[in-house]
A protein has these predicted regions:
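Substrate-binding groove of N-acetylhexosamine-processing glycoside hydrolases
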Residues: 1-155
Length: 155
């Protein structure tokens, strides 16, 4: 079961903003980063650096051991470590909505854009836009209805 910090550690801050709750020792995780997880090509899961700049994902696997036995990957998992959790609202604001990207990759570990070599590939961006639309139109209203304290995007 894969759980890499760059995409699935939900206790990481959403952004590098110093006022943002969450850890930052391993980067930042937002909905976009959780959605970009590629369980069968984890090196290409890191599409942006910690400053939001696009990375050259075509070279990220260079010199690293390739994953050859896909059948050994049985799932993905989000992690929530509790060093900075002081109340249940902290839990829900860390988890929602960024965990939706992890759910999406657990459901579809080989998205259509998996083989792309550019972080800003149009196929990826189109699917990311569809994902955002789904979260905004279905998930956020549910969180509101259930009175779940989720992290709202800052302007």
């Amino acid at each position: 079961v894969l759980s890499n910090m760059t995409n699935t550690y939900v206790d990481f801050a959403y952004t590098p903003d110093k006022t943002e709750r969450g850890l930052s020792w391993g980067g930042f995780v937002d909905e976009r980063r959780s959605f970009s997880l590629l369980p069968y090509d984890i090196y290409r899961s890191v599409r942006w650096d910690d400053h939001g700049r696009i990375r050259d994902i075509s070279t990220l696997p260079d010199g690293k051991t390739p994953l050859k036995a896909r059948e050994n990957v049985i799932g993905v998992q989000a992690q929530l470590w509790t060093e900075t959790v002081r109340c249940f609202d902290h839990v829900t604001s860390y988890v929602f909505p960024k965990v939706c990207g992890v759910f999406e990759r657990a459901w579809n570990a080989s998205p259509s854009w998996e083989g792309t070599t550019q972080a800003d590939d149009p196929a990826f961006l189109q699917e990311l836009d569809r994902y955002y639309s789904t979260v905004v139109s279905h998930e956020i209203p549910y969180y509101d209805e259930m009175q779940i304290a989720y992290r709202q995007r800052k302007n």
